[in-house]
Amino acid sequence: MFMAKTGNGTLTLEKRANHPGSGRRKAAAYQKGRQLQPFETAAVKKLIGEGPYERPLLIEYLHLIQDAEKCLPAGHLHALAELLRIPMAEVYEVATFYAHFDVVQDGEEKPEPITIRVCDSLSCMMAGAEKLIASLGAEDMPQVRVLRAPCIGACDVAPAAEVGHKHVPKATVAKIKKVVEKGDFHATIPKYQNLAAYKKEGGYTVLGECLAGTRTVESIISTLSDGGLRGLGGAGFPTGRKWTFVRAEKGPRFMAVNGDEGEPGTFKDRHYLERRPHQFLEGMLIAAWAVEAQEVFIYMRDEYPAVLEILDIELKALEKAGLLKHTKVSVRRGAGAYICGEESAMIESIEGKRGLPRHRPPYVAQVGIFNRPTLVNNVETLYWIPQILEKGAEWFAGMGKNGAKGNRSYSVSGRVKKPGVVLTAAGTTVKELIEACGGMQDGHTFKGYLPGGPSGGILPASLSDLPLDFGSLEKYGCFVGSHAVVILSDKDDMKDVALNLMEFFEDESCGQCTPCRTGTEKAVKLMQSGDWNQDTLADLAQVMRDASICGLGQAASNPVVSVF
């Protein structure tokens, strides 16, 4: 403000004009940016319901819009930002991070309403996925789009495809066209053991004893530790020790179940959840009781629509039966991001954010969901808990061999006659797994194998007598990880195999750190050009291992180094 003299000599108080760059701007006479229309807000409310709206549920809201609209219209995203009272940029960065969301700007055409996803990961490619993709592209199918997709967890029925939410095992053009013509794109729910059947065989007895005080937390942790139960999602960390670490942290505490088994070649969790979901759920509820978790978040991949529906049905049954009184259970649906299998990235996604791995320390056992101590366990790890506690540590530990403890669920796919989940002793060899799967396919000779999915590297047939368990393969530059075993034959070019795996990692890199983002891209370009300079690729691999934030970048080069 300043004083100005008028013509009659009086003084008036006037407002000084802001000069450019002063940092003080006049308020805009109109709102900047895209204007939200009332009908857009009404449309979003109709899909996600009336409030109160929660910021951590952003991804769930995006799913509801995507499912209904077959895309994410810009106006709906704007309305969602207003309802959540967060910046539009925050909604946009999440929506564009996940592969299963299709953001459509104003004026852009919506994608075709029917989406066919064909898996192009290793097992499916060996089973003819490339030819299937090309054939589908040549078909005249109105209102249909065909997309390549990373592993959908159906490697035992390769080549696999998904039409909407319906899986098509051993997919052919004819099978897929039949689904499209029929118009039923909902998941096919397999026959599974429900709550009544599980309780009839004694299910939830152990949980009941825990809640009644008959069993102590200390005795349960001791039994799991003596039995040798380890994390079966890939890391192999001792379960009892992890529970002890979380219990030592001050509450409130949370628990997260990692059901995002996106490692190509892995399908064991789906196998159990589609057959005996309550054995897993009882193990989960025992774990929640042991660490006094006030809420459990089951993070399940979007590629498992049948599992998501089963969990919805059976959690409601548990609620009705009064078995969820000691904790709250919520299901969070992934959206096509492999990186969310990394525990801290999964926690970011549970909080409704981009799935970017966190820097550690602190570890999630100390600072996890909503910055509280969090127990993270894999589906199969929890699956074995009721039986171990019922039958004893000696029962479980005694099933291993070659120095290993317990049993293992090996997901076996590739060039075997009968792919599937092989439940057998920990420490089993690949030679024994091939025999359990009916031997090699006719006309194929065993050449090599992936012992633990793409991250685990590639081993030659000459090392077929190695026991497959945690710690047994590291001296060969490999590891067993999630026990995803892919069998290769003399018909497979190892360089083509390694390129397929590296292309997967390039596509799934979250892009947060340069060694992984640029390293995978550079490796793919070198491999595609035919320039397999061993020194260059080895140097690149070393940088990725040493400097990447998480396991994706650290392990991405394993298949490449394996074929030198």
Each predicted region: which residue ranges?
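Gly-rich Lys/Arg/Thr-decorated short loops/hinges at beta-loop-alpha junctions or inter-strand turns
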Residues: 199-205, 257-269, 364-369, 411-416
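Ferredoxin-type iron-sulfur electron-transfer modules in oxidoreductases and energy-metabolism complexes
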Residues: 26-116, 120-186, 205-226, 250-255, ...
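Hydrophobic alpha-helical positions that pack around
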Residues: 308-426
